[in-house]
Amino acid sequence: MSRTATIKRDTFETQIELTLDLDEQTPIKVDTGIGYIDHMLTLFAKHGRFGLQVDVKGDLQVDSHHTTEDIGIVLGEAFTQALGDKVGIERYGAQFVPMDETLTRAVIDLSGRSYLVLHAELTAPTLGTFETEVVEDFWQGFADQARANVHIEVLYGRNTHHKIESMFKAVGRAMRQAITINPEIKGVNSTKGRI
């Protein structure tokens, strides 16, 4: 069974085409028009061992908010579609990722219920032209459309770039753990019989 998804989203603010492959590390190609987000999505895919292609045209003349949030929405939707009925998946993932002086923890539950908890003090308001406050909007869109509990906590650190980068790496690794198929799991990993 192929666990892949291609999602297209067209609004007055963004045009996004995203292809996700959960099991094959196809070449990672990301072009969002925002260099920092390109870097973060590439890290997410590399450390999660996902195939990922993303092409975005956004209203960057306004700012990076719509583009960043909509990418999170589409990425979450792609995970939901690629996972299908979630039969046999671990469901949970938890990872700690250090980056120099920073340590971040990410914990995921692919429960079918959306919830985001994000604890991170991002002291730099921008990185280049990227507004760091939209990182939370990205993860909210992702959690909502992946229908997942997403808990991200930067435990400590100084550098805002390192904090955000460790988030993307930690969530990528936690998602890899959560989507892994375990042959010992019969059906779905829930007493309800569905997730």
Swiss-Prot record:
<keyword id="KW-0028">Amino-acid biosynthesis</keyword>
<dbReference type="GO" id="GO:0000105">
    <property type="term" value="P:L-histidine biosynthetic process"/>
</dbReference>
<comment type="pathway">
    <text>Amino-acid biosynthesis; L-histidine biosynthesis; L-histidine from 5-phospho-alpha-D-ribose 1-diphosphate: step 6/9.</text>
</comment>
<protein>
    <recommendedName>
        <fullName>Imidazoleglycerol-phosphate dehydratase</fullName>
        <ecNumber>4.2.1.19</ecNumber>
    </recommendedName>
</protein>
<dbReference type="InterPro" id="IPR038494">
    <property type="entry name" value="IGPD_sf"/>
</dbReference>
<dbReference type="InterPro" id="IPR020568">
    <property type="entry name" value="Ribosomal_Su5_D2-typ_SF"/>
</dbReference>
<dbReference type="GO" id="GO:0004424">
    <property type="term" value="F:imidazoleglycerol-phosphate dehydratase activity"/>
</dbReference>
<dbReference type="GO" id="GO:0005737">
    <property type="term" value="C:cytoplasm"/>
</dbReference>
<keyword id="KW-0368">Histidine biosynthesis</keyword>
<comment type="similarity">
    <text>Belongs to the imidazoleglycerol-phosphate dehydratase family.</text>
</comment>
<keyword id="KW-0456">Lyase</keyword>
<dbReference type="InterPro" id="IPR020565">
    <property type="entry name" value="ImidazoleglycerP_deHydtase_CS"/>
</dbReference>
<keyword id="KW-0963">Cytoplasm</keyword>
<dbReference type="Pfam" id="PF00475">
    <property type="entry name" value="IGPD"/>
</dbReference>
<dbReference type="InterPro" id="IPR000807">
    <property type="entry name" value="ImidazoleglycerolP_deHydtase"/>
</dbReference>
